[in-house]
């Protein structure tokens, strides 16, 4: 698997963490499809896609594509390339579609909805859920509560941006991680700020 080709894709997934995503996707997708919350332009999605291909599994990736709080105008991660002047809003969907076609990652299925709304209509089990959407505590915890029951026993929950020290980063993903450990999950593996938990 040549995953170095994803290095230049717009996104916030460091290569060594993306490499871990690919490995976990390859392992857990043997038992079913994978669901990602928080697509942005699809960098992490491509890592997941590459790992799942050998098992002929799909990656369902959910995002409203109007950006998180930090992507908006005058915020830290505002990016002119994904700003749609015709609507005066962030729109990362066109770049995601471009990346899917560029890398022929046709096992990626974009879902343009709010995560919690999509979960209400979702009935199929998944082998792995990757939470990397909004990093507010309410949103991150809602993502966990909405999708936790969809993960099969022995499946994986992956959470990005885990910082024990508040000075290094936001605490919402870390709180969700600790909550999951108290609610049916155990540590499986960690690479820097991305952690994989296994569901009992």
Predicted regions and their residues:
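S-adenosylmethionine/decaboxylated-SAM
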Residues: 2-12, 18-200
């Amino acid at each position: 698997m040549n995953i170095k080709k994803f290095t230049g894709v717009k996104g916030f997934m460091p290569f060594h963490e993306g490499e871990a995503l690919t490995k976990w996707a390859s392992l857990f997708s043997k038992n079913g499809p994978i669901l990602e919350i928080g697509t942005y332009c699809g960098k992490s999605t491509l890592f997941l896609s590459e790992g799942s291909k050998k098992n002929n599994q799909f990656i369902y990736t959910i995002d409203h594509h109007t950006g998180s709080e930090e992507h908006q105008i005058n915020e830290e991660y505002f990016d002119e390339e994904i700003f749609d002047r015709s609507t005066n809003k962030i729109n990362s969907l066109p770049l995601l579609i471009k990346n899917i076609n560029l890398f022929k990652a046709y096992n990626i299925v974009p879902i343009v909805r709010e995560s919690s709304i999509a979960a209400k209509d979702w009935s199929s089990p998944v082998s792995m859920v990757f939470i990397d959407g909004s990093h507010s505590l309410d949103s991150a915890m809602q993502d966990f509560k909405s999708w936790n029951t969809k993960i099969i026993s022995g499946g994986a929950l992956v959470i990005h941006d885990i910082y024990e020290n508040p000075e290094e980063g936001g605490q919402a993903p870390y709180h969700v991680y600790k909550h999951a450990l108290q609610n049916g999950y155990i540590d499986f593996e960690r690479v820097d700020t991305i952690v994989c938990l296994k569901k009992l």
